[in-house]
Each structure stands twice: as structure tokens, then as C-alpha cells.
């Protein structure tokens, strides 16, 4: 996915890996599709390109106390390198209304924001994460 705006992110706890990608053409055998649209339950996304081929351009780890900047149009995914990660994200102004997603058409797509948590659940997760290594 990419983002609606660029952002700075500081790792407050844990280690986070960013893997960056670029679209590298298309192949009729590819099961991947580039879609544009909101990430919420019931929203429809627009197919930008079918049968996309994408390739990893780089990866980097950010440890606790470090920061990185991600531009709005950078396709990336994150991996948690520690059991928990807490970040502080500061977004730039919106550049576009919705992000792009690389979708694996052989699997159902589930957006992380499609089932929002209650405030109580969020605070329980935060408390658990903070206390995980204490």
C-alpha cells in the first residue's frame, strides 16, 4: 500500500521493518492487482491495473528511538521485528483522497481498518503493549 499523505514516523518501542516496492510492468499470469480506494468496510476500490508485477526496491529496519520519512506515493509494507511496536506518526497535508493497494487476487482482501476498535479496546492494547517487556 501507499498513503494519502507523506509522514514522519518515530519508533517509540520495538523494531519495525519497512519493505519498499515498485510496480515493474505486468504479466497475464500475475495474480496481483493495483487498486485505489478507501480502506473501510463496504467501500469500493477502483482497479488501477490488473496483472501487475512488482519488485522489492529496498528494506530497512528502524529501532526504538529512530525516525523515518515515507512519501505518499511509496508502496511499502511493514513487518514487526519485535513482539510489539509503538510508533508516533505525524502526517503531512493530504495529497490524495485514498491510498493504493497491491491486492493478491487469490486471497480475500481484509483491510486493517475495516473493523475499528472501541476506545476501550485501543487502551487495553496500548496498556498490554507497553507492559509486554516490563
Residue map of PLM features:
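Histidine-centered active-site/metal-ligand motif
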Residues: 1-3, 76
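Short, conserved beta-strand element in jelly-roll/cupin
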Residues: 4-18, 22
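A short hydrophobic beta-strand segment most commonly corresponding to one strand
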Residues: 8, 83-99
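Short beta-strand His + acidic residue motifs that chelate non-heme Fe in jelly-roll/DSBH
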Residues: 18-19, 76-81
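Short acidic-glycine-tyrosine-enriched beta hairpin
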Residues: 22-72
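Short acidic/polar capping segments at secondary-structure boundaries
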Residues: 73-76, 93-95
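Mixed-charge (acidic/basic) macromolecular-recognition segments
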Residues: 82-83, 106
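Non-heme Fe(II)/2-oxoglutarate
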Residues: 92-134
Amino acid at each position: 500500500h501507499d498513503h494519502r499523505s507523506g509522514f514522519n514516523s518515530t519508533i517509540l518501542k520495538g523494531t519495525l521493518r519497512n519493505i519498499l516496492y515498485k510496480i515493474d510492468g505486468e504479466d497475464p499470469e500475475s495474480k496481483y492487482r493495483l487498486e485505489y480506494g478507501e480502506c473501510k468496510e463496504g467501500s469500493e476500490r477502483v482497479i488501477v491495473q490488473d496483472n501487475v508485477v512488482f519488485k522489492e526496491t529496498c528494506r530497512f529496519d528502524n529501532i526504538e528511538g529512530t525516525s523515518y520519512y515515507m512519501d505518499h506515493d511509496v508502496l511499502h509494507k511493514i513487518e514487526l521485528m519485535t513482539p510489539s511496536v509503538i510508533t508516533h506518526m505525524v502526517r503531512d497535508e493530504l495529497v490524495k483522497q485514498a491510498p493504493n493497494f497491491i491486492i493478491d487476487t487469490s486471497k480475500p482482501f481484509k483491510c486493517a481498518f475495516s473493523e475499528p476498535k472501541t476506545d476501550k479496546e485501543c487502551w487495553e492494547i496500548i496498556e498490554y503493549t507497553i507492559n509486554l517487556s516490563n
